[in-house]
Amino acid sequence: MISDNVKKGVIRSPNRALLKACGYSDEDMEKPFIGVVNSFTEVVPGHIHLKTLSDVVKHGVYANGGTPFEFNTIGICDGIAMGHEGMKYSLPSREIIADAVESMARAHGFDGLVLIPTCDKIVPGMIMGALRLNIPFIVVTGGPMLPGEFQGKKYELISLFEGVGEYQVGKITEEELRCIEDCACPGAGSCAGLYTANSMACLTEALGLSLPMCATTHAIDAQKVRLAKKSGSKIVNMVKEDLKPTDILTKEAFENAILVDLALGGSTNTTLHIPAIANEIENKFITLDDFDRLSDEVPHIASIKPGGNHYMIDLHNAGGIPAVFNVLKEKIRNTKTVDGRSTLEIAESVKYINYNVIRKVEAPVHETAGLRVLKGNLAPNGCVVKIGAVNPKMHKHEGPAKVYNSEDEAISAILGGEIVKGDVVVIRYEGPSGGPGMREMLSPTSAICGMGLDDSVALITDGRFSGGSRGPCIGHVSPEAAAGGVIAAIENGDIIKIDMIGKEINVDLDESVIKERLSKLGEFEPKIKKGYLSRYSRLVSSADEGAVLK
């Protein structure tokens, strides 16, 4: 065992003394050391219940002959960080979390890990760190939040972001907005739709790293507690079997995750996180081109918020990810999972599917997959749109650019009435390096939706979007403006042509004009000169490469 390097032999007497100071016995030190990686925090609703889950995980570890050691990572709530400088830290926090998991596990000689994340960047961050070690690990995602209810109508967090736009144009009163605010988030869990946190939980299960039904089992459900205990027991077996993550995470496993993502219409942020996770195994193991290639294999089969009217609780009750496997079984690759059964064995074990929620492939929500990769002279390296959440009339759009050099400028313009039907809002210098941190543009997109412009106005950015964004929102434009991408050359009034079905995005300018404009810009001057974001800005790669540190 790896932990023998920490605890075995006369030379490790000082090490054992320190462990005994923590209350561990000689008997405990004979067992596999299991790190229980928690991300409990009192500021994130998706994480406020994780103490309970970690305690239950530890019971499972003990019961099956392991010795658990709990430690914590940070966890940022994207919703609370949204719309201000705090959002610049969200994506970069993924790398801090990965480094923390790697450092703690290696320093203390853990034989295996149980990861307990919930929200957006914490899930991929923990997995990335654990992959660097290539020791057995299993993931227990914290589970979704239930939607709230007010006057017989269901609400969740995105209702509030769009509600701000509705208030601005007089659709609702401030009192009505406050009533929705009081009920939209009724308790623990990740926001109730198929936003980034829940998308990543679903893909973690699809990768084979969580037990079946873990992704969709809700935070307040006793089944989540049972899954946590079973996961604690399971990791001890995995250590004894030496079932490493690289035994599970083959190219085909990543393809399964992408197929599930495309079929469900998950968050566009998955196109950052899945390549970043794969990068820990092999450089460019998975790229944006894989999303593009696989998008032709599956249709969009589930109408879940923000791309429909269903919630995560509906997906769970319809059969969860095993049911999605079953519906897609002609496309799903047969790969290993931490459960011990293969993906197709899990698919065949499904006893019930609600086909009103998880549609059959021959009767999908949309014929095209839920995510789309676009390329053209505006984004030579690609950009991403959640086409499953776009009004079909906006699948093709041509309009004049309204250009803003930050999210703050754009939201002021939108709420100030500067945007009219037909416009293409361009928000730049918000990429991984330029932002820095690649902020989510949820406030601008929600304002556009709330003001009723989402069927006539497109938004393009080198930043990214919340999983809760809907409408013609095209993000991750690569190369970004700070790297001299074409988006930096766009001026007010330039005509932008978008064809989501044809997978194209172009600005109607001659190449010579683009080159001339870019030549006059000079070298990008970083916005932040010190601290973590300054280092991040210098070291981060492009969005099409997963925005990983070089």
From Swiss-Prot:
Its cofactor is [2Fe-2S] cluster; Mg(2+). PROSITE patterns: ILVD_EDD_1, ILVD_EDD_2. It catalyses: (2R)-2,3-dihydroxy-3-methylbutanoate = 3-methyl-2-oxobutanoate + H2O; (2R,3R)-2,3-dihydroxy-3-methylpentanoate = (S)-3-methyl-2-oxopentanoate + H2O. GO terms for biological process: isoleucine biosynthetic process; L-valine biosynthetic process. One of its GO terms (cellular component) is cytosol. Transmembrane segments: none annotated. Mg(2+) binds at D78, D120, K121, E440. The modification N6-carboxylysine is found at K121. [2Fe-2S] cluster binds at C119, C191. NCBIfam families: ilvD, PRK00911.1. Belongs to the IlvD/Edd family. This is Dihydroxy-acid dehydratase.
